[in-house]
Amino acid sequence: MGQNDLMGTAEDFADQFLRVTKQYLPHVARLCLISTFLEDGIRMWFQWSEQRDYIDTTWNCGYLLASSFVFLNLLGQLTGCVLVLSRNFVQYACFGLFGIIALQTIAYSILWDLKFLMRNLALGGGLLLLLAESRSEGKSMFAGVPTMRESSPKQYMQLGGRVLLVLMFMTLLHFDASFFSIVQNIVGTALMILVAIGFKTKLAALTLVVWLFAINVYFNAFWTIPVYKPMHDFLKYDFFQTMSVIGGLLLVVALGPGGVSMDEKKKEW
């Protein structure tokens, strides 16, 4: 009974949190989700020559192609962010940002770095959830019209988004024998599984948001590193990418897990 009471109290707290924040939580989620694209687009502007020279040196593609790559990244990311925040052409913005992720994965050789690849996939999961949200908003004007068959892609996008989001947490697992690491791995893995299968989803996602935010502020405190040091840019990139995954989790909290989840199946039982 003690465990049931504790779980019930936690779920009541999560429900109360949602009631208080439901008006602005989706907006905060979107801002967090696109923050890494916004930061990267601004960085492309201020580090234009460095980014161009890096691409030119890595791929030996010449000044013109390297400059075109940087310009495409800058324009694509900033335009996508503006469209998402203004809720205009959100689906096109998501597809454009998907393209940016794929382009950067190849250009910066992220494909061969498992940790960064998993984080990019997690970022793609957040965009999938945003795409699912935009589809539901687009259909809201037809409330009352049967759309069971049409809503199916949205449900599977939510499932795919949830599964991809948990990849971020797999990069945070520590494989050492310390007591703290073992406890953190067990709790984190349990929460990841709950989010992926959609069981107690909002509570698990909200708990992961708090946990990931604390880890992010502690380990990626780029503001404590002088701007001229390379570690500053590395931590800043990591910080905002993690914030984007937090945004995806906040969308899960705000919108729920979708139809393909244990929470929804329980209602049918």
Swiss-Prot record:
Name used for this protein in its record: Surfeit locus protein 4
Gene Ontology biological process terms in this record: COPII-coated vesicle cargo loading; endoplasmic reticulum to Golgi vesicle-mediated transport; Golgi organization; lipid export from cell; lipid homeostasis; lipoprotein transport; positive regulation of organelle organization; regulation of lipid transport
Keyword entries, A-Z: Endoplasmic reticulum, Golgi apparatus, Membrane, Protein transport, Transmembrane, Transmembrane helix, Transport
Positions of transmembrane segments: 64-84, 92-112, 179-199, 203-223, 239-259
Underlying gene: SURF4
Renumbered ranges of motif Di-lysine motif: 266-269
Family: Belongs to the SURF4 family.
Entry remark concerning the domains of this protein: The di-lysine motif confers endoplasmic reticulum localization for type I membrane proteins.
Topological category with respect to the lipid bilayer: Multi-pass membrane protein
Pfam families (alphabetical): SURF4 (PF02077)
Location of this chain's protein in the cell: Endoplasmic reticulum membrane; Endoplasmic reticulum-Golgi intermediate compartment membrane; Golgi apparatus membrane
Subunit and partners: Found in a complex composed at least of SURF4, TMED2 and TMED10. May interact with LMAN1. Interacts with ZFYVE27 and with KIF5A in a ZFYVE27-dependent manner. Interacts with STING1. Interacts with SAR1B. Interacts with TMEM41B.
Function: Endoplasmic reticulum cargo receptor that mediates the export of lipoproteins by recruiting cargos into COPII vesicles to facilitate their secretion. Acts as a cargo receptor for lipoproteins bearing both APOB and APOA1, thereby regulating lipoprotein delivery and the maintenance of lipid homeostasis. Synergizes with the GTPase SAR1B to mediate transport of circulating lipoproteins. Promotes the secretion of PCSK9. Also mediates the efficient secretion of erythropoietin (EPO).
InterPro entries assigned to the protein according to its UniProt record, in alphabetical order: Surf1/Surf4, Surf4
GO molecular function, one term: cargo receptor activity
Protein species of origin: Homo sapiens (Human)
Source domain of life: Eukaryota
Cellular compartments per GO CC: azurophil granule membrane; COPII-coated ER to Golgi transport vesicle; cytosol; endoplasmic reticulum; endoplasmic reticulum exit site; endoplasmic reticulum membrane; endoplasmic reticulum-Golgi intermediate compartment; endoplasmic reticulum-Golgi intermediate compartment membrane
